[in-house]
Amino acid sequence: MTMVTRVIMTDDDSQSLCFLCFLLFFFITAIAVAGDSLDSDREVLLSLKSYLESRNPQNRGLYTEWKMENQDVVCQWPGIICTPQRSRVTGINLTDSTISGPLFKNFSALTELTYLDLSRNTIEGEIPDDLSRCHNLKHLNLSHNILEGELSLPGLSNLEVLDLSLNRITGDIQSSFPLFCNSLVVANLSTNNFTGRIDDIFNGCRNLKYVDFSSNRFSGEVWTGFGRLVEFSVADNHLSGNISASMFRGNCTLQMLDLSGNAFGGEFPGQVSNCQNLNVLNLWGNKFTGNIPAEIGSISSLKGLYLGNNTFSRDIPETLLNLTNLVFLDLSRNKFGGDIQEIFGRFTQVKYLVLHANSYVGGINSSNILKLPNLSRLDLGYNNFSGQLPTEISQIQSLKFLILAYNNFSGDIPQEYGNMPGLQALDLSFNKLTGSIPASFGKLTSLLWLMLANNSLSGEIPREIGNCTSLLWFNVANNQLSGRFHPELTRMGSNPSPTFEVNRQNKDKIIAGSGECLAMKRWIPAEFPPFNFVYAILTKKSCRSLWDHVLKGYGLFPVCSAGSTVRTLKISAYLQLSGNKFSGEIPASISQMDRLSTLHLGFNEFEGKLPPEIGQLPLAFLNLTRNNFSGEIPQEIGNLKCLQNLDLSFNNFSGNFPTSLNDLNELSKFNISYNPFISGAIPTTGQVATFDKDSFLGNPLLRFPSFFNQSGNNTRKISNQVLGNRPRTLLLIWISLALALAFIACLVVSGIVLMVVKASREAEIDLLDGSKTRHDMTSSSGGSSPWLSGKIKVIRLDKSTFTYADILKATSNFSEERVVGRGGYGTVYRGVLPDGREVAVKKLQREGTEAEKEFRAEMEVLSANAFGDWAHPNLVRLYGWCLDGSEKILVHEYMGGGSLEELITDKTKLQWKKRIDIATDVARGLVFLHHECYPSIVHRDVKASNVLLDKHGNARVTDFGLARLLNVGDSHVSTVIAGTIGYVAPEYGQTWQATTRGDVYSYGVLTMELATGRRAVDGGEECLVEWARRVMTGNMTAKGSPITLSGTKPGNGAEQMTELLKIGVKCTADHPQARPNMKEVLAMLVKISGKAELFNGLSSQGYIEM
């Protein structure tokens, strides 16, 4: 009998079963989720590290410090960002980490990844599909790489910031871009090779605010909805069509619109006036016609109006005069013709007026532009102006850049042009000017450029030009100038630092495409190294940044120091005197022109011996062709280790062929032809042997290597036509010598053994760009002095001389008796140099890769920002440094006033007025580091012990051992723990990023210490920051408690110290963006200082009591 059991389930049983199933599902899910933990994230990061190290065996970045430790350490790895609970990895920042090769293909395993920054590397290949599986990614920056292929990121629907600029990505994005733009706020695809249409790809991107699609190959019409964005740039594409009124609806939110460099046409609509927040309107380089819209005059916020290179009507609307905030007006290349319009003389608010290439004729006085009171740059080049140069220009005392080149001006240059003390660039080239160069130009001490080429100027270069200590770029080629090159002229360009400092203070924001490209192309000698490198990369965007670099004194390219192949980024000068009638000898003092990288003296009548001191210059280009130089070619030319172009042809040099030329390993162009008295053998190996026979023509006494095809070469008749104006008798002597040499050679040719001159290859060039992990010597703007061993060299940043032996003597061989301080990065010794200067010698104690990075970072700061011979008054001056293996030494100015840390709690020695002065001094130093250095510098350890006082009590910031250059934004991934307990910003422990805002936080703590006389951390229940916030938030100061003042007069200084404490509280806000920047802080301090002046006659013993 078979029993069948039937189970009947009630409703309660069903619910219980469902609940059990839910628990089972939850348990399985929990197990799966548990697999995604910090442990698994660590394994992915270690896999990423191995991947990167295998493809970058030499130049490794921050990832080398990712070590196998417990899981908590993962969140402290440099470049790694975790959740606040440190439970998962959410971000990776490996910008500028010398990464090359294809992109890692397993980022998606980091399931909580929201931030990925791999910018400024050399990552190549296509963007892998794996990246599309990082579904939580919000910030992706792959800019400044060499990525290729097409763009496909369909899975990144949460992406808010996308930066793929400066790559080689191709293809049409019309179908791919809308798939991931739903949450996108920032989209930067500039400077790639994208193609196709973009007129409808943004319609579904509801959150988009900032778009930069410039410098691609997009075609068709523009997207009509750009009016709802904040910034929109499609500059330098192939877009066309008309810009319609409907694109500027009433709710236009644009602040920047850049349509330049396309083929838009028709009339531009006046409805642009609906964009009342517009700061920049750039229509340069299109095909717009008709009248300039009068409605533009109602956009009161407009600062930059770029309408050049179109065909607008020459009638300028009167309404534009209402733009009271207008700084830059560009109406160049519109072919206006006729006389210059009178209205330009009424733009009294404008600083930059660019009107070049408009086919203007007549004079320029009629428009009254020479009476504009605020004019800083006036560009009237490439027109047809004629007549005398107007003397009235000299009355514009604000003028810095005057460009009148490529016109038909004639007559003398007015002496009055020497009365513009702020003038930095004067370009009068390619006119019909006659007469002499005014001696009054010697008063132009701010002059950086003087361009007088291709005129008919005569006479000597006035000795007074040597007083132009900022004059780095001097071009008088192709005139009729004569006379000697006087020794006094070698002083030109000897100290441009004051001019660069003025430019660093100028904060006018000028966008790309405002005439600087044309200026740079005129002023950079495109055919001569090293400037040809810069000329080759001039695009509209690069011109803006390069122009800014030049004006502020930052180097555009690495320049060699004399006698070394080691390069550093520093400003470089040129001297162009070719095509004149200069005569006499070159003075030995030319060695003083220590920034000179290009020297062109060709096609003149210089004579005598070439001074050996020329070998002390950092030259990359030297052209002496077609002069009358004689004597031996100095062996010292072999010290020009980075010389690329050398032309000594058509002179009267004699003696043996200089073997030192074979040491010029970078020489790419060489010509020593037609110096018939040079003798000896041409090297058969080395750099010189790489040139063909055309480099040696007309030298019958030279012995050629066997591999030269000499048929008739060294016995060739030399005609008068080739030799120019050489005397006929001298010609006969040359031919006789050539024939005699040929006869002797036939008799002894079987016994001659060609000499082999081996080239001693110099060490591999170090460009200070992170391409090496170690280098024996790095140079800056000074010279080098060898120690007794000849290996350790001291690099001096001022003009004084001292050696490593002097350092040893000053510190008694680094004796313990000379120790005046110890820190986390080394020991400081006090000593006296032979010239009597007291110095503080800092010997770095850390070794290995990290110590090397720290030292190199500091050297980059020194090279780029000149903390030596010209030092900021609130930064401790550095006299020099040396590096040889483990020896890493800095030689600082000794500060006799000691450390602020020793005085900050002493309420009798440090009075309240002095405390405000110290706070102001430190702020000025940090303003320089953050806002006036390029790139910006983060100190990373602002504290009382890093503030030193000189003998007058002035404060200076010291210890840049961990300084880093910031290439993008204001953050930099730290490689070691930076900062000191009590001073470190709270976000540092989460982001591991050292930022300028972090410096502001540390500075805020320092101001609290100054205001209270209390330490940041003193063992109390409340740290200083917490106490200050409580006090200031509760407004307890208004009741006089708990803050009171000690001293005989309790009221003195209370208000100022309270204000100082308020600044400290503002600087220590929890959120970085809520903190002021250092410029804003300095402005607050200046106000307090102004109030403090009212108390100068009273007792100043006022301090806050706890």
From Swiss-Prot:
UniProt enzyme class: transferase
One GO molecular-function entry: protein serine/threonine kinase activity
Membrane topology according to the record: Single-pass type I membrane protein
Chain ranges on the Extracellular side, renumbered to this chain: 35-736
Compartments it resides in: Mitochondrion membrane
Leader sequence segment: 1-34
PTM annotation (Phosphotyrosine): residues: Y983
Any single biological process term in GO: defense response to nematode
The protein, known as: Probable LRR receptor-like serine/threonine-protein kinase At1g74360
Organism of derivation: Arabidopsis thaliana (Mouse-ear cress)
